[in-house]
Amino acid sequence: MRVLYDNPFSPFARKVRMVLDHKGLAYEAMDALAPEARDRLAAVNPRLEVPVLDDDGVVIVNSADIVAYVEHRYPERPVYPADPVRRVRARAWERRADTLLDAILHDISVFLWAFPGSTPPAGLAEAAREDLEALYADLERALADGGPWVCGDLSIADLALFPHLTGVKLLGVPFTEERHPRLLDWYRRMRKLDICRGDVARVQSFLAARAGDQPALQHIIWRGDRVEWLLARGFHEWFLGEIRAGRVAWPRA
């Protein structure tokens, strides 16, 4: 039995789900971040993070490790390019999505979903815009060089980037026809894929079911890459203030 400890809003869980769907692998998905699932998630991942894949008793945590396991165990319909150079590039894009892109989007959006009405530190939005624009430019070049997808054929690069890039418009940093025509075309083609249509529909259904039901949060769980981006961008004092105010929590070891 294959079980995916999932959450429809987690970009990492969304990536894994799309990989499983792309490969045609059956699985049972559960929203492991729901309060009633907390104990089950803790039993397989004490950090209480999703996704986790239980493949008939083989338990894998961390989305990149899950994808690597699935690719090796079920090589049909690969998500890693066969060409070694393109494979390295695809893995690099996955890593960039999982670290830099996730950190930017999390650290900006936390003021929308966690503490609505609160004021972000001065300069945070500008730092996010600068780094996102640089990433868009790199993607534009990658699509010009490789096409039709980020690393030639559809790969983990596309499936890792897509969940994050579905949210950038809401943050006020969209990619545009004028400045990023190839990236916009890529995004539109991604949204037409069955696995991406299903992904977007699950997110929309999840958000609609919870509209107006956002609980008040006392603290946010922060982890490495999300903290690293803040510190690298010079927001040390703001983050120290959050720690002193008791609004920062850390994942379990």
Feature locations, PLM:
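A generic membrane alpha-helix/interface feature
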Residues: A42, E49, P116, L171, ...
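Charged/polar, low-hydrophobicity segments characteristic of intrinsically disordered regions
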Residues: K192-A209
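Long, charge-rich low-complexity segments
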Residues: Q204-W238
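Short capping/connector residues at structural and topological boundaries
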Residues: V58, P84-V85, L154-S155, H180, ...
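Juxtamembrane helix-loop transition sites at the ends of transmembrane segments
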Residues: N45, T119, R179, P215-A216
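GST-like fold's C-terminal all-alpha helical module
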Residues: A97-K192, G198, L231, P251
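Residue-level detector of family-conserved "landmark" positions at structurally sensitive sites
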Residues: M30, S63, E178, V200-A201
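GST-like domain detector, emphasizing the conserved glutathione-binding G-site
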Residues: M1-E130, V150, R226-A253
